[in-house]
């Protein structure tokens, strides 16, 4: 088959034609002939079907028949000479045979024959193609006269690309001829044929030819030709060119289409006047159809050009933008004349009709690259566009009352419009005015988003004496929203995206989401007054002028809620008292909103009360009361009770729905029942958000709905739903807040929340992912707590942070300690985790874990964090004997040498156990004890710290206490106290004492320790308790009789607390060896005294009082003198500071309102911690934000610090100064103390927020470097700003009758 016959050539021609048809799309997409050649040359590499083409199969058979014998001979010769080719020799064989074959005579003869034959085949194909092309052009000329001249959507859309048609490559000489034929002086038929040829040519060839400049000029002339066929053809060519040309060319084409002078002449020549009265414009009218096509092509280009113009010089973009703006600025002086005079139809009206929502402008303003050019040109040359847009909005606002009946109809028709023969063709003047208003509103809404855009304001417009400011514009928009007509029943389901209300709300939402925009545009008194005007009118008993009451009020509430989510907006609503209430008082917006909401819930307003509208206004209140400062303002209104009452009413309605009976009419329609359930959930959701703050959680608990609210939160949490549309974070903070209290943790347990967290942890820790195959095993964890378990670990830390949580979940619960554990048995409770992961005291527990070391390390890490809370540790130690278990674990973890004692095995578990043993045994602040690190060191001795296997601890972990020397300053305090004893103390003595105290604290605070400090504290308490004005609690009769209290017994928890206190006191050299009985006696007296002032708790939530750390602190402060300690505590119990410094003082106390006494929520949490969060947000916002992001709350760590009197967090001198400061300066200093400590830790807090271990850091690490004296001046500043609020609220803990 070395020669081709005539039949072979015909077959080759057919196969080649098929191949070219198969790759037609690839070739036609090539921008040049060279690129098309490259595509064909690399077809085998890029086309997976290459070897399936018949042409390729034919050539393969031809090569095999021509060279098969040669290849066999060469292969045989090579294998005889070299042996058999295997392995790496295979490549050598192939290369050698290929080389010899290509040098053979047969190969050269085959290639020559193939080339000659293919040249003849290709030439035949080209000739046949030219004949077919001539026939096609003739057919096109015949068909063209039969086509409709108004195929706008088909002919003008740039989606009808030239790449979708068949065309041949064209030579430059042919393009020169086409350019000459398009000369305006040529006959119409000649120009038509030239345009036909041009449309079939590749745009890349046309644009790269030398005659393009003249050709473009002739095309621009043809575009304005009266003959619609010619202009349509030019538009068709331009549309194809746009999609395949670089910007430097398309900008010229765009300039040709949007030629300002040409279009202006066109508008004036055809006298395109704006329709008036009953007249309308017809989109099918030839001149109008041409304009619409031209404008639409321009608009399509405007919307697409933003995707690529940044890759080109800025001057190209400037030309396009300036051409557009100059076109749209045509006729501006006639365009905004008075409505009664005749107006001209302008390009802005047509662009509004084609792009109603100004998508082109939004895209141009999106990127900084183009936005700067647009704003610069608008400011310098085309500000009239902005003025006209503003004027149109004002005109619509002034006339929207008259248009109200027609607006809905226009919206409905315009939303579903489709320009063309199949759609609408007639547009009235009102419709054109409306689309121009929508377009203008969208342009202005986008303009004011940006700083330089807002600089255009104020703007002077006609018929307004004063320029229109930004505030004026927003007020106008809100009033437009108010006047939008109420939709009829049949249209409520329509998503009327072009309704003025929705358009205005879109602008307002955008402004709310941008801080700078909101400050300049929304956070203004006139705007707030406009938003609240309907509320004030309704509260006065009148009806506001609103076309759709429910819609307008719901949108108002939505805007107010968005304003309330920001700090600046919330402050404006809470504190700016520029509004006049229904009673004529000047009040803030927050008071007005909550009054209106209460009236809505009570159904006392003249308005159709729908659940959606009520829910919207409750949501506004919620954005305020879920912050500490907002709750402070709204608390007097008892909104939580109003919402709870509405929830109870709704809940009873849904419960009363009877079981459906066949044949009986339903009591409630399914839709109505759904709305009742939705309203019930909405009320629960809003009630739940009271739990965002400590005081709010107390209010929620008092409603009796905390269990239902937590259950609802759990249902949303499991679905991973947001807290609200305005909330950036999930339910983490709220869960942590709830878990801090006894009723909260009980609600979390009963809802299933705790079980879900435990199961998730167990799945991540022990089960792994079920969908991972064995071929992709899980990586070996490098960290003690793997990243997959970190989230569950932090959730458990948050959950068990409070001793109340540990008590409710583990108190009086024995470990299962089974003899055998099923491998499939999952942990479902905290008790199970304690049994399976922490207290591993049998082989059965070890064998039940798939990842024993990793899981046990996790458990020990959790135990370490739990033991940081001394009360939690006492409970766990008293129930489970943790210390003995850990010591035994250390003793078991040694080698077994043939003789002598074994050595400790240093592994992850022994290091973790060692850390916990030191932590729970050594008591002290940052400079009083040393904790061993958890990480090993490099070198020969990776763990140089002593291992603990028996108590007492090695001295390595305990620092020596410095001796306290008497100094001049101490003598000064002593002299002051001595002089006070000798003279009668008057009312000014306390002021003198405070000044003297502050002076010593500022100069030499480290001398304010020892006996002098005890004397100072004792005298201050004596002085305050002797004054009826300073006594807060009524006097209580208590006879100190040692024999009667000695019969009382201390619980195991209290006994362990005594041991820790004695250990710390002896370490500080404050107590004698025989002080145990004295401390026990003091605690028994305190219990006896306080038990006489406690109510009988009917609730199961008695709370977990733990050890009395304040009494132990006083005992150490008085150097173990039980008489002085008891005397001071009894006098101190009458003072207000005792309520907050001495936690057992108000535990279930008769002095509290009965509902608070039975709630098990202590004032330290609901008052002190609440104000810590409030002040932290105002004074140290970065720290507050860090807590929010971590899911932890400042109240949790503060309750822990205060509950154990800063033991293990501060050194003993700082603890003494903390107590003395709060007694002398006032109980509100407890709040300032916590804020100061968190401010001191700011850098550490921010760093550990990044590493996602903030909770662990705050609980495990002491407050390094903190000195009360260094922050006393800062605390005095906080006192000046906040004392009136904080101290008054602390005083309000007693019932008003007291």
Curated annotation (Swiss-Prot):
Lineage of the organism: Eukaryota, Metazoa, Chordata, Craniata, Vertebrata
Functional summary from the UniProt entry: Required for high-level Shh responses in the developing neural tube. Together with cdk20, controls the structure of the primary cilium by coordinating assembly of the ciliary membrane and axoneme, allowing gli2 to be properly activated in response to SHH signaling.
BP term (GO), one: non-motile cilium assembly
Assembly description: Interacts with cdk20, which promotes cdk20 stability and function.
Sorted UniProt keywords: Cell projection, Cilium, Cytoplasm, Developmental protein
Name recorded for this polypeptide: Protein broad-minded
Species of the source: Danio rerio (Zebrafish)
Subcellular location: Cytoplasm; Cell projection, Cilium
Pfam families: BROMI (PF14961), BROMI_C (PF23440), BROMI_N (PF23431)
Rab-GAP TBC domain residues: 1171-1283
A GO term from the CC aspect: cilium
UniProt note: phenotype after gene disruption: Fish are viable during embryogenesis and early larval stages, but exhibit curvature of the body axis and hydrocephalus, and curled cilia in distal kidney tubules.
Matches recorded under SUPFAM superfamilies: Ypt/Rab-GAP domain of gyp1p
């Amino acid at each position: 088959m070395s020669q081709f016959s005539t039949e072979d050539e015909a077959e080759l021609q057919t196969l080649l034609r098929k191949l070219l048809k198969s790759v037609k799309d690839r070739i036609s997409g090539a921008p040049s002939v060279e690129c098309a050649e490259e595509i064909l040359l690399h077809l085998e590499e890029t086309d997976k079907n290459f070897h399936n083409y018949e042409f390729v199969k034919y050539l393969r058979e031809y090569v095999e028949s021509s060279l098969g014998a040669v290849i066999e001979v060469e292969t045989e010769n090579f294998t005889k000479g070299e042996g058999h080719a295997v392995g790496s020799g295979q490549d050598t064989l192939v290369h050698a045979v290929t080389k010899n074959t290509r040098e053979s005579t047969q190969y050269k003869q085959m290639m020559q024959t193939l080339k000659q034959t293919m040249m003849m085949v290709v030439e035949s194909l080209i000739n046949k193609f030219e004949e077919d092309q001539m026939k096609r052009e003739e057919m096109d000329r015949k068909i063209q006269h039969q086509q409709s001249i108004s195929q706008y959507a088909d002919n003008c859309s740039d989606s009808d690309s030239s790449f979708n048609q068949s065309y041949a490559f064209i030579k430059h000489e042919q393009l020169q001829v086409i350019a000459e034929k398009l000369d305006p002086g040529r006959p119409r038929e000649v120009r038509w044929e030239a345009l036909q040829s041009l449309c079939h040519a590749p745009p890349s060839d046309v644009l790269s030819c030398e005659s393009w400049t003249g050709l473009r000029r002739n095309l621009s002339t043809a575009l304005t030709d009266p003959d619609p066929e010619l202009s349509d053809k030019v538009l068709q060519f331009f549309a194809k060119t746009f999609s395949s040309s670089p910007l430097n060319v398309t900008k010229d084409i765009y300039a040709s289409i949007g030629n300002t002078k040409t279009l202006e002449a066109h508008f004036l020549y055809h006298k395109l006047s704006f329709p008036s009265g009953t007249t309308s414009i017809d989109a099918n009218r030839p001149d109008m159809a041409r304009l619409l096509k031209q404008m639409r092509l321009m608009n399509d280009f405007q919307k697409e050009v933003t995707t690529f113009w940044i890759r080109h010089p800025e001057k190209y973009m400037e030309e396009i933008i300036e051409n557009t703006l100059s076109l749209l600025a045509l006729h501006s002086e006639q365009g905004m004349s008075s409505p009664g005079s005749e107006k001209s139809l302008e390009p802005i009206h047509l662009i509004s009709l084609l792009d109603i929502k100004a998508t082109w402008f939004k895209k141009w303003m999106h990127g900084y690259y183009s936005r700067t050019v647009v704003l610069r040109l608008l400011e310098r040359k085309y500000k009239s566009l902005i003025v006209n847009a503003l004027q149109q909005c004002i005109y619509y606002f002034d006339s929207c009352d008259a248009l109200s009946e027609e607006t809905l109809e226009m919206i409905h028709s315009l939303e579903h419009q489709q320009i063309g023969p199949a759609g609408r063709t007639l547009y009235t003047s009102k419709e054109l005015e409306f689309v121009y208003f929508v377009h203008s509103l969208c342009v202005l809404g986008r303009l004011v988003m940006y700083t330089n855009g807002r600089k255009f304001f104020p703007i002077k417009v006609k018929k307004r004496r004063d320029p229109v400011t930004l505030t004026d514009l927003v007020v106008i928009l809100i009033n437009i929203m108010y006047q939008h007509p109420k939709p009829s029943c049949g249209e409520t389901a329509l998503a009327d995206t072009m309704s003025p209300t929705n358009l205005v709300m879109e602008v307002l939402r955008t402004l709310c989401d941008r801080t700078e925009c909101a400050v300049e545009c929304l956070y203004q008194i006139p705007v707030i007054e406009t938003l609240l005007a309907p509320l004030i009118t309704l509260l006065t008993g009148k009806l506001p002028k609103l076309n759709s009451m429910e819609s307008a009020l719901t949108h108002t509430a939505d805007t107010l809620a968005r304003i309330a989510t920001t700090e600046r907006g919330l402050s404006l609503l809470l504190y700016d008292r520029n509004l006049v209430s229904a009673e004529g008082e000047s009040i803030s917006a927050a008071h007005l909103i909550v009054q209106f909401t209460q009236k809505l819930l009570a159904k006392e307003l003249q308005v159709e009360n729908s659940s959606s509208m009520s829910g919207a206004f409750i949501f506004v209140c919620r954005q305020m009361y879920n912050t500490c400062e907002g709750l402070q303002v709204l608390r007097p209104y008892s909104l939580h009770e109003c919402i709870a009452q509405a929830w109870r009413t709704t809940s009873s309605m849904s419960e009363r729905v009877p079981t459906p009976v066949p044949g009986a009419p339903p009591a409630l329609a399914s839709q109505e029942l759904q709305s009742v359930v939705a309203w019930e959930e909405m009320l629960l959701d809003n009630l739940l958000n009271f739990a965002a703050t400590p005081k709010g959680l107390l209010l929620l608990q008092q409603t009796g709905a905390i269990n239902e609210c937590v259950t609802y939160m759990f249902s949303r949490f499991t679905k991973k739903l947001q807290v609200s549309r305005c909330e950036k974070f999930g339910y983490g903070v709220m869960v942590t807040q709830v878990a801090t209290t006894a009723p909260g943790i009980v609600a979390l347990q009963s809802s299933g929340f705790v079980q879900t967290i435990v199961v998730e942890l167990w799945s991540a820790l022990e089960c792994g992912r079920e969908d991972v195959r064995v071929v992709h095993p899980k990586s070996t964890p490098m960290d003690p707590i793997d990243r997959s378990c970190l989230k569950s670990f932090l959730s458990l830390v948050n959950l068990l942070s409070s001793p109340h949580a540990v008590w409710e979940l583990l108190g009086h619960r024995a470990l299962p300690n089974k003899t055998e554990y099923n491998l499939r048995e999952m942990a479902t409770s905290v008790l199970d985790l304690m049994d399976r992961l922490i207290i591993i005291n049998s082989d059965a527990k070890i064998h039940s874990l798939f990842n024993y070391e990793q899981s046990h390390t996790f458990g020990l890490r959790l135990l370490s964090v739990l033991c940081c809370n001394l009360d939690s540790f006492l409970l766990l130690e008293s129930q489970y004997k943790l210390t003995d278990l850990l010591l035994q674990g250390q003793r078991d973890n040694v080698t077994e040498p043939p003789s002598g004692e074994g050595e400790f095995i240093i592994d992850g578990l022994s290091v973790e156990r060692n850390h916990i043993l030191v932590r729970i045994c050594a008591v002290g602040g940052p400079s009083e004890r040393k904790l061993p690190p958890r990480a090993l060191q490099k070198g020969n001795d990776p763990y140089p710290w002593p291992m603990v296997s028996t108590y007492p601890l090695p001295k390595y972990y305990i620092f020596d206490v410095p001796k306290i020397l008497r100094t001049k300053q101490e003598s000064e305090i002593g002299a002051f106290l001595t002089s006070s004893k000798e003279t009668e103390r008057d009312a000014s003595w306390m002021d003198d004492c405070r000044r003297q105290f502050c002076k010593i604290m500022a100069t030499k605070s480290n001398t304010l320790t020892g006996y002098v400090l005890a004397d100072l504290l004792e005298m201050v308490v004596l002085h305050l308790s002797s004054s009826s004005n300073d006594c807060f609690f009524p006097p209580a009769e208590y006879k100190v009789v040692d024999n009667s209290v000695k019969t009382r017994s201390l619980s195991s928890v209290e006994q362990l607390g005594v041991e820790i206190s004695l250990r710390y006191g002896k370490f500080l050299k404050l107590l004698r060896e025989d002080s145990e009985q004295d401390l026990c006696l003091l605690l028994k007296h305190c219990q006896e005294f306080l038990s006489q002032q406690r109510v009988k708790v009917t609730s199961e939530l008695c709370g977990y009082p733990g050890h009395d750390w304040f009494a132990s602190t006083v005992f150490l402060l008085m150097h173990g003198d039980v008489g002085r300690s008891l005397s001071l505590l009894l006098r101190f119990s009458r003072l207000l500071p005792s309520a907050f410094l001495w936690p057992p003082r108000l535990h279930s106390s008769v002095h509290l309102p009965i509902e608070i006494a039975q709630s098990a929520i202590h004032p330290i949490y609901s008052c002190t911690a609440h104000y810590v969060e409030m002040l932290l947000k105002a004074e140290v916002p970065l720290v507050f934000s860090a807590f929010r992001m971590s899911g932890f709350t400042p109240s949790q760590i503060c309750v822990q610090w205060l509950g154990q009197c800063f033991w293990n967090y501060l050194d003993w001198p700082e603890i003494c100064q903390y107590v003395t400061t709060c007694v002398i300066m006032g109980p509100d200093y407890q709040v300032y103390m916590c804020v100061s400590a968190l401010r001191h830790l700011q850098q550490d807090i921010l760093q550990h927020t990044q590493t996602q271990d903030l909770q662990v850091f705050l609980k495990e690490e002491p407050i390094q470097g903190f000195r009360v004296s260094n922050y006393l001046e800062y605390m005095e500043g906080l006192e000046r700003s906040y004392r009136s609020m904080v101290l008054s609220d602390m005083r309000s803990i007693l019932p008003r009758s007291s």
